[in-house]
């Protein structure tokens, strides 16, 4: 049996780090006359006069992955994309905390207990520089899982082809579960209203659910 853990929301608290960075660079600094703006050519932040025509703001917790612009307010979707994947990918995806202090201890224990009978996989929806940032995140916390697969909206079918059970916080995966696949929802603010046959609150709870599923 191939058991996969999805990173965002299940293992990594991505939006907490994004909130901290947004607060610092788009709210706190925009209260001043000059703000810091990332310059790709110089690979550094430069001082720029404040544009008061747009009001930045946060609306949290995140309730929808499909409408992040409602929670992290930018002038357009390109600016939202750049925030996550161009300007701050290492800070957001690499330096984000784990969902709980014990998350990686629990994950590594699951890996060590099940690896002889099952293939344990880490999967994650990543774009561009968020991939190396995610590898840094996993190494930072001492993740022992050997197989890591990145996917996107274009390659998601290949992700499903390589797994049998998915532990995820992504509501789209719960709602679009393929036949003959098992999806276990890990509860977050943005999937509370999505029904799932199997639900856990954190990675550690998978241990008890595994026994009930009788996968030996």
Indicate residue ranges for each PLM-predicted region:
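Short amphipathic alpha-helix with an adjacent loop that forms part of the alpha/beta core around
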Residues: 157-160, 206-216
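Active-site neighborhood of HAD-like aspartate-dependent phosphohydrolases
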Residues: 1-75
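Short acidic-hydrophobic, aromatic-tinged amphipathic segments that line or gate anion-handling sites
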Residues: 148-152, 198-208
């Amino acid at each position: 049996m191939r058991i996969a853990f999805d990173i965002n929301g299940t293992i990594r608290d991505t939006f907490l780090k994004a909130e901290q960075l947004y607060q610092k660079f788009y709210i706190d600094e925009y209260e001043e006359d000059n703000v810091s703006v990332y310059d790709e050519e110089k690979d550094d932040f430069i001082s720029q006069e404040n544009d008061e025509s747009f009001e930045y703001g946060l609306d949290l917790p995140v309730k929808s992955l499909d409408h992040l612009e409602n929670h992290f307010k930018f002038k357009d979707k390109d600016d939202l994309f750049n925030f996550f994947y161009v300007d701050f990918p290492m800070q957001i995806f690499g330096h984000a905390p784990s969902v709980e202090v014990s998350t990686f201890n629990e994950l590594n224990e699951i890996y060590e207990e099940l690896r002889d009978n099952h293939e344990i996989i880490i999967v994650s929806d990543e774009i561009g520089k968020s991939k190396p940032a995610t590898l840094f995140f996993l190494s930072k916390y001492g993740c022992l899982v050997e197989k890591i697969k990145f996917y996107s909206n274009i390659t998601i079918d290949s992700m499903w082809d390589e797994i049998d059970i998915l532990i995820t916080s992504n509501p789209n995966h719960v709602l679009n579960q393929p036949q003959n696949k098992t999806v276990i929802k890990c509860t977050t603010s943005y999937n509370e209203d999505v029904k799932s046959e199997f639900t856990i609150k954190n990675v550690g709870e998978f241990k008890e659910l595994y026994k009930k599923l009788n996968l030996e």
